[in-house]
């Protein structure tokens, strides 16, 4: 799709050479939604997708939902550029610069880090390319991007805290398994949970540590915490399902019963977490809905046409607080 833009020479020869490899999959491999077919190319809206790439069940479901929404049949040529690793910001900055230099019509961005995006976003703005943030926010002025589409991390995490208060009316020793440091999602989930339990009597935070969204790290961190505290932990808030599932295994390995001796609450709502909830190994799962590709499609079209968008578009989700609720969610196909 052709739009009038100002053209900028944004990247030098060396950077462009490196990006040829980094974006090779955007139009050629099986992971890419877009291709460079000549037929009908001028009629398609070209969208660069600066993505995180493989990181876990939620991320896989979310990125696939975006790919499924931005198809050629829907009028798009999607250029998918996953980060070299889930924490590699440089590859994302390079991909973003390439998309601006290639004069795509819009950019979707899920940042591996919240900071460091000002210059990139300013270049996109100067080139009149709207940027839509998916899931994660950035530490930049909101006039540098069109909108952010995401479930409300603060509200989702607050639901965990509110459930915990009702489950432990006299308080508890608790531990928090956090995601990758520096991400907006981590900060927001801490904020929501802390807001919910702030001032409640009897709540003792034993500590918090990153487990990098990983089941293995969630297990190892929990093992260490239980040993260091003579198993005197009643509640674990895992900021994603994988870490919570790992924590449940550590609880069992310590000779304790998850759901009875130690309650574990998680955020995401993957099929694995719902199965663990149905089995009694998790006690609470807050869904962080990954399926908002269609919302992103509408936002891109509106941004390109010069329409106004809310700066934050909230994606709704659900909570599941019992084995029965977990099984019902599975039966309804709500896992991913």
Model-derived features with residue positions:
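Hinge/cleft segment of the Venus flytrap/periplasmic-binding protein
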Residues: 13, 43-44, 177, 181-185, ...
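Bacterial lipoprotein signal-peptidase II cleavage site
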Residues: 23-39
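Short beta-strand elements at the ligand-binding edges of bilobed clamshell
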Residues: 80, 140-163, 176-180, 208, ...
């Amino acid at each position: 799709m052709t739009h009038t833009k100002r053209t900028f020479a944004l990247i030098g020869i060396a950077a462009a050479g490196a990006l040829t490899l980094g974006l090779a999959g955007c139009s050629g491999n099986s992971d890419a939604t877009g291709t460079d077919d000549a037929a009908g190319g001028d009629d398609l809206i070209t969208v660069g997708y600066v993505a995180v790439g493989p990181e876990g069940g939620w991320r896989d479901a979310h990125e696939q939902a975006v790919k499924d929404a931005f198809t050629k049949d829907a009028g798009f040529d999607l250029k998918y550029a996953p980060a070299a690793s889930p924490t590699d910001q440089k590859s994302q900055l390079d991909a973003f610069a390439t998309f601006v230099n290639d004069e795509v019509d819009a950019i979707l961005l899920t940042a591996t880090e919240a900071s460091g995006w000002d210059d990139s976003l300013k270049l996109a703005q100067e080139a009149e390319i709207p940027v839509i943030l998916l899931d994660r926010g950035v530490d930049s002025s909101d006039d540098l991007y069109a909108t952010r589409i995401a479930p409300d991390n603060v509200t989702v995490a607050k639901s965990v805290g509110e459930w915990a208060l009702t489950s432990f009316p006299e308080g508890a020793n608790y531990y928090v398994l956090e995601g990758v440091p520096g991400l907006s999602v981590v900060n927001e989930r801490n904020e929501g949970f802390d807001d919910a339990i702030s001032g409640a009597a009897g709540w003792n935070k034993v500590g918090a540590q990153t487990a990098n969204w990983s089941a293995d790290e969630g297990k190892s961190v929990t093992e260490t915490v239980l040993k260091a505290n003579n198993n005197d932990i009643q509640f674990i808030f895992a900021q994603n399902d994988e870490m919570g599932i790992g924590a449940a295994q550590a609880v069992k390995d310590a000779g304790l019963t998850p759901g009875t001796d130690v309650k574990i609450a998680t955020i995401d709502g993957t099929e694995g977490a719902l199965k663990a909830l149905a089995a009694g190994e998790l006690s609470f799962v807050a869904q962080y809905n990954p399926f908002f590709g269609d919302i992103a499609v509408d936002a891109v079209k509106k941004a390109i046409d010069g329409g106004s968008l809310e700066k934050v578009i909230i994606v709704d989700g659900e909570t599941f607080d019992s084995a029965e609720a977990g099984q019902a969610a599975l039966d309804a196909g709500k896992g991913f």
